Amino acid sequence: MIEYRKSGLSLNHVVGCPLDCGYCVRHLFQNFDMKQPHLVVSDREAVDLLVNHWAFRPDATPIQIFNRATDPFLPGVKEHLVATLELLDDRGLKNSVLVITRWKIEPDDVERLERLKNLRVTILVTWSGIEDARVEPVDSAHAKNSLRVLHDNASRTKAILYWRPLIAGLNDSDNHIDRALVLSEYADATVFTGLFHREEIRKHLREAGVTDLYPEIARRKILPAEIEGRVTNAFAGKPLFRKTSCGVAYAHGIADYNGRFGVREICDICPRPQVDRCTRTHLKPDVARVQELAALAQLKTDHISIDDRRIELSGSTEQQRYFIQHTLNYQVHDRSHPHLHGRHGRAEVGWE
């Protein structure tokens, strides 16, 4: 129910989604076949579990709500979303909270979000422009309308055009890019990313009759270099980001909590004011501090190296790395999964 992911500590006390997006990460968590959203524990219990989690740090740990088990704005789910946010906000917490949706956001929803006083809430509105219902059955018009509603009604609540998944030959045409450019005018920032082409997702799409989207599966998201180049050229001078936390940080006028400034080539498209913010907070930690956090994460490692780009460990899990990374605002990598220069943490597919 609570798990650390790259963009934050993920709380999922409602499970089940009827939207049936073929590429959904719920395939990886064995809950894709749960179509009816159901409550696992009460909102109050969920919040208590979250704030007492060993990795939670008040005002620091980024939080995600319902990002791997349902869509937070579905009927019957959004009441739990808002109640959870209100319970956290009432505690005076100033943590960043990420809410990802491809469903309908109404003016009344935004009005309730705007009443929050402490949390830094970001709504990431997923749009792909994919028209093949076997891959994505949800009408992309919902995302367009939600972005407009947020643009017209939100001030404190920030909106991201979450342009994903970009897939070669499916939704990477010049027309798709032009449509994304129009939508970006309604958002505080745009984040673009590729496809998780894992075995579970490929199997589901094959069973739906979809020809393999890529010739191979990959641990990391696939976004070929040619697509990235066309997107970054089209968005030149606009607030476009490769990484979710970078877009979220820009929208709120803060430095990236994932410390990606160390991996400088990621920042070559970032607006200058954002680069300056991240420059000021990029502080190389000492080994003793990393060892202290590793112990809290129950990570046994005598092989810590730190340079100006990142901390490098061995034998770590993603959850252990993300906890250290978010606590220090400094990139943490494992030697068994090297980050190659210029790949921006993506799969090698399309970069060979």
Task: Name these PLM-found stretches.
Residues 45-228:
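Conserved AdoMet/S-adenosylmethionine-binding subsite of the radical SAM
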Residues 26-29, 71, 166, 236, ...:
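Residue-level marker of positions within ordered structural domains that often coincide
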Residues 42, 175, 284-288:
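Alpha-helix capping and helix-coil boundary motifs
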Residues 202-352:
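C-terminal accessory extensions appended to soluble enzyme cores
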Residues 19-22, 181, 229, 233:
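A broad, structural surface signal
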Residues 1-122, 316, 323, 327-352:
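Conserved Radical SAM active-site core
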